[in-house]
Curated annotation (Swiss-Prot):
Compartmental location: Cell membrane
UniProt cross-references to InterPro entries, sorted A to Z: Electron_transfer_protein, NrfD-like
UniProt superkingdom: Archaea
Quaternary state and interactors: Probable multiprotein complex that likely consists of DmsA, DmsB and DmsC.
Topology with respect to the bilayer: Multi-pass membrane protein
Induction cue: By anaerobic conditions. Its expression is under the control of DmsR.
Ranges annotated as spanning the membrane: 22-42, 57-77, 95-115, 135-155, 186-206, 220-240, 257-277, 281-301, 304-324, 333-353, 392-412
UniProt function note: Dimethyl sulfoxide (DMSO) reductase catalyzes the reduction of dimethyl sulfoxide (DMSO) to dimethyl sulfide (DMS) during anaerobic respiration; it can also use trimethylamine N-oxide (TMAO) as terminal electron acceptor. Subunit C is proposed to be a membrane anchoring subunit.
Name this protein carries in UniProt: Putative dimethyl sulfoxide reductase membrane subunit C
UniProt key word Phosphoprotein: no
Gene of this entry: dmsC
Length: 435
């Protein structure tokens, strides 16, 4: 047991080998390119992006939604067992919070290039308009990031103290201290679960409350966003866990991996099958009163993004995880998880396109795009929203994502993410409870 404890208190990545240093070099290069692209965008303005008046939310917001969901789902899955006094999936808790922290930092940073004038972001604090969902979302993102930092430190600080790390902030390792930490973990989970639900619900309501965007208005928007967070968050946690098990000293329990794969299948069924039907079927019935017309309207997607989400990112991983003989294989769990995250990405892309493709003034000349006017064509006006991300947007986005990847790499290198052995279950008063 002592050897197990000593091993658990070490980082799962003792040093960066050739592969690790190469990966760090790639991430650092992408970060530098991203910073350069952002500087170029700041100098020339948002005209360097593909966004215009008729399509004012682009790649930054699409991926903001994705990474908010990845973070919320990761923290929900890491904190829910502690809330219910369960030791199940304990081996994934620390890694899950680390991934959640990296994702929420990426999500928060993606706001900066989207607003065009990041030097004015302080006005969220100095002169907030509480009628705007954006103010609430900004506040929750900040609170959520701080909660992730606190929770990750709380989960690891005793092991950090046991090996004399300065990251423990001079906290000592003792039996009484660990008992107190168990109590704090419970109450942190009490705060983390509603915070995670609020984070992604408010993000969904930002879309639903936009004036003049009827395609986004739905009472199901918050449940859909929470389901999306559970699918993408668990999918990313499984991907990172399997990769960490393969390339570091982190050990992912095979039984719990299989169980989490089954749970991912349940989340996929609820999200892609039930909630999709609950949202689309009433609309189909309202427009078509024949059985085949209703069925075809429900099944036929609006765009290719619909099929990338529901087919490749929904039906395929669901079938893989619903087959008992397949979901026991780590490679199958990994593939299904990648596809689930991939599908969630295209669901977000489809969501933004759904709201912006149709404009409220569809008669000529339409809406001023806000772009350049050559004087020979009608490119200054548009009656339909179109969008293609520019190289500047892609470079900035990849640079921001590289920051999240670097945070996860740093956590693997410097934090004790492996649990040695199950502790006794804990009560809210800090005492032990036998299971």
């Amino acid at each position: 047991m002592a050897d197990d404890d000593t091993t658990a208190r070490r980082p799962v990545l003792s040093s960066f080998g050739t592969l690790g240093r190469g990966w760090l070099g790639v991430l650092a290069l992408l970060l530098v390119i991203g910073l350069g692209a952002w500087a170029y965008q700041l100098q020339h303005g948002l005209i360097e992006t593909g966004m215009r008046n008729v399509f004012s939310w682009g790649l930054y917001i699409m991926l903001f939604v994705l990474f908010v969901g990845l973070s919320a789902g990761g923290l929900i899955l890491s904190s829910a067992p502690k809330f219910f006094h369960s030791q199940r999936y304990e081996g994934f808790a620390r890694l899950g919070v680390l991934v959640s922290l990296g994702c929420i930092i990426v999500a928060g940073l993606l706001i900066l290039p989207d607003i065009g004038r990041p030097d004015r972001i302080y006005q969220f604090v100095t002169s907030p308009d509480f009628r705007s969902p954006m103010v609430w979302d900004f506040g929750i993102v900040m609170l959520y990031g701080a909660l992730n930092v606190w929770y990750l430190w709380l989960l690891t600080r005793r092991d950090l103290a046991a090996r004399g790390s300065r990251l423990s902030l001079w906290v000592s390792d003792s039996a009484a201290g660990r008992d107190r930490d168990r109590t704090l973990m419970f109450w942190t989970a009490v705060c983390a679960l509603p915070a995670a639900v609020a984070l992604h619900s408010v993000t969904g309501w930002i879309f639903a409350t936009q004036v003049g965007r009827g395609d986004w208005f739905s009472p199901l928007v918050a449940p859909v966003f929470i389901a999306k967070a559970l699918v993408s968050g668990l999918g990313l946690l499984l991907v990172v866990s399997i990769l960490a098990d393969r390339f570091t000293a982190f050990t992912a329990d095979r039984g719990e991996l299989t169980s989490l794969g089954k749970l991912l299948g349940i989340f996929l069924a609820f999200h892609v099958v039930y909630l999709l039907a609950a949202e689309r079927l009433p609309h189909a019935w309202a427009h078509h009163f024949g059985f085949w017309a209703i069925t075809s309207n429900f099944l036929i997607g609006d765009t290719v993004y619909f099929w990338l989400w529901t087919g490749l990112g929904g039906a395929v991983p669901l079938l893989l995880l619903a087959t008992p003989s397949l979901r026991r294989r780590t490679a199958v769990i990994f593939t299904a998880s990648v596809l689930a995250v991939f599908g969630t990405l295209f669901e977000g892309i489809r969501l933004v396109f759904t709201g912006y493709q149709r404009v409220n003034i569809n008669a000529a000349p339409g809406i001023a795009t806000g772009g350049e006017y050559a004087g020979l064509t009608t490119d200054a006006w548009a009656t339909a929203g179109t969008y293609t991300p520019t190289a500047v947007e892609i470079a900035v986005t990849v640079g921001v994502i590289s920051i999240g990847a670097l945070i996860v790499m740093a956590g693997l290198r410097y934090l004790p993410l492996q649990r040695a052995a199950p502790d006794a279950a804990y009560a809210t008063d800090g005492g032990d409870r036998t299971q």
